[in-house]
């Protein structure tokens, strides 16, 4: 994990970056997050676990314990109503089965809030409540989820599941982070912690060896980035240093040079029907990879390819359009244009890594408690205390 920020109430960093004169960045993340974290955690103290076993879709080829979702942009063919679905890029089919995805997002929101509240207060009631949900998802035989995504983003008449569906479990990342936050508390027994980590280890093995996982790794756009982000997070939780090393090299040698242009943009995302949202999503995911994998001796935020592609360039490209979206020179997103931006994690992680006040200041001005379901789905980093305090 990124070790440069230690547990404390006030983060004060003195630096000299890229030849600039030494400056001081004073950033009280605990104070910024305190009210919203404790408010949200208070609500989640009353919530009972809901896992994949709480509902089943008859179109699923899996069992009650298998996560199931359907491809977003696939619709009935008007010319062949009973035939295979057809694709409409960027247009979400509202009749798709999304109950398992909603349950996982809810689990992520609960975990993030409770884990963050425990960091702030060390009150075991937050850890105890989180453990109830962890046991339901990963331990209890009647309610746990199988550690694979064989039936994610299925398409009627075409596929019972696809590698592209792996992106659905980006919402387990802050679950993993929350586990790390409470793992030394009295709420989680050694036996339960071992079982939970074994679940993540099994899922990590599936992600890195199954044909769906390999396909997602090699997809080439934001899906490859999110595959690496998940793999890095789960390897960090399970202390799989071999996989973490692989992810560092994958970021340096594949993701950054293959997806970022020399101006810091992401051409593969700009070609999509939602170029603004996808660009934000991708820079956030890359910054999150850097936040997990950076070490004192290998800081991915400072890494640059030989031709100058790096995270600073990527954030410099998108930041002006976060500040003023009306300047966006590309096509407007076909859906959810008005809902973006929100509190993009790349601004925080990059701002702290480079000690750049304009980014942390901008981050603070943006909405942290967004409610649009599509925005929530595409913002897996919601509770930054889990990420920057060890």
Q: What residue spans do the PLM features occupy?
A:
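Bacterial N-terminal signal peptides
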Residues: 8-16
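Hydrophobic alpha-helical membrane context
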Residues: 15-18, 242
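Extracellular glycan-targeting catalytic surfaces
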Residues: 20-214, 225, 294-297, 304-390
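Short, contiguous, pocket-lining structural segments
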Residues: 163, 167, 171, 192-199, ...
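Long, repeat-rich segments with strong aromatic
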Residues: 233-329
């Amino acid at each position: 994990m990124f070790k440069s920020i230690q547990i404390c109430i006030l983060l004060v960093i003195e630096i000299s970056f890229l030849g600039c004169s030494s400056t001081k960045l004073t950033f009280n993340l605990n104070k910024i997050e305190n009210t919203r974290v404790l408010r949200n955690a208070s609500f989640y103290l009353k919530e009972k676990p809901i896992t994949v076993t709480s509902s089943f879709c008859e179109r699923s080829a899996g069992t009650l314990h298998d996560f199931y979702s359907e491809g977003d942009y696939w619709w009935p063919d008007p010319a062949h109503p009973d035939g295979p679905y057809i694709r409409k890029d960027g247009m979400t089919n509202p009749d798709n089965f999304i109950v398992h995805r909603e349950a996982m997002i809810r689990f992520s929101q609960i975990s993030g809030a409770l884990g963050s509240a425990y960091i702030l207060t060390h009150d075991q009631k937050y850890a105890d409540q989180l453990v109830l949900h962890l046991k339901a998802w990963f331990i209890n035989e009647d309610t746990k989820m199988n550690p694979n995504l064989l039936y994610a983003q299925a398409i009627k008449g075409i596929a019972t599941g696809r590698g592209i569906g792996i992106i659905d479990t980006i919402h387990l990342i802050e679950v993993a982070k929350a586990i790390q936050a409470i793992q030394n508390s009295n709420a989680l027994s050694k036996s339960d912690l071992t079982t939970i980590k074994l679940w993540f280890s099994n899922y990590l093995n599936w992600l890195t060896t199954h044909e769906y996982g390999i396909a997602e790794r090699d997809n080439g756009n934001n899906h490859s980035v999110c595959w690496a982000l998940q793999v890095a997070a789960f390897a960090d939780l399970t202390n799989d240093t071999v996989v973490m090393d692989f992810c560092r090299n994958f970021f340096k040698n594949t993701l950054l040079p293959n997806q970022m242009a020399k101006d810091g943009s992401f051409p593969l995302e700009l070609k999509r029907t939602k170029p603004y949202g996808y660009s934000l999503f991708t820079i956030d995911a890359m910054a999150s990879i850097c936040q997990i994998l950076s070490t004192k001796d290998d800081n991915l935020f400072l890494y640059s390819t030989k031709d100058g592609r790096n995270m600073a360039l990527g954030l410099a490209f998108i930041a002006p359009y976060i500040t003023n979206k009306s300047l966006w020179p590309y096509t407007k997103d076909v859906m959810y244009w008005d809902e973006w931006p929100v509190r993009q994690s790349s601004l925080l992680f990059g701002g702290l890594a480079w000690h750049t006040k304009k980014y942390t200041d901008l981050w603070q001005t943006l909405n942290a408690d967004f409610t649009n379901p599509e925005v929530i789905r595409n913002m897996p980093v919601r509770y930054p205390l889990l990420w920057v305090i060890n």
